[in-house]
Structures are given as structure tokens and as C-alpha cells.
Amino acid sequence: FTTVERARHLTVGLTAIDPTGTVLFDSVTACLAAQMFEDGGMDTDAPRRVAAQLAAISRHPANFVCVCDGIFTGGEAYDPWTAAYVGGLAHICRTLAAEFDVVCEMTMGLPHLWKGALPRA
């Protein structure tokens, strides 16, 4: 396998991806934080940009797996910056779920299938 580390300009990494292969993107959560809060400010366009870049990448390899922490499901009252981040993360996950064939949530090692079917091993 090959490791490609990028926090910004994600589609530049496409040149390193085998179109017949599988990409594991870990993690959407860290990628959004890196793009949204660089230089001490808040880039409110980051969620849209990250979602678009990941959707574009997902069309390149045969299989694309994204890891995202579901911190937006907690129902807590957050400060404005955290609320913007959590909302942005939810936007990315909804965008990717609409794009992907399979959406699976793992909880305590157990899969919960939201969309599609798990591939046979």
C-alpha cells in the first residue's frame, strides 16, 4: 500500500491513486479541522470545499472508504465555532452519503448499515 498525506488540495493526490485500487481516507474529521481553522481563523467555506474534494476523489478509485467521527450526533449546546465545525462535519457526511453506494456506521465494532450492502469477503 501507499500512504498519501494531505490536509489541503486533496485532489492533487489523485496522481498517486491506482484507479483499480482502494483508498482509505482517515479522517474527514481531522481534514475539516485542518482546513477550517488554519491560521487561527475560521474558514466557513471549508465544509463545502472538503465535501466537493472528497466526492471528486471518490469517483477515481474502485473503492473509497472514509472515516468520520459522528461528533455531530451528540445533541450538545456548543459555542459558535464548535457549532460551525460540527455543522460542517454533518454537511460533509450527508454529501458523501448521497454520493456513496454504501454507508455503514461502526459502533463498538458492530456495523449498522444505513445504505447499500456490505461487500462479501
Residue ranges of model-derived segments:
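Conserved nucleotide-sensing/catalytic segment adjacent to the nucleotide-binding pocket
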Residues: 1-35, 43-44
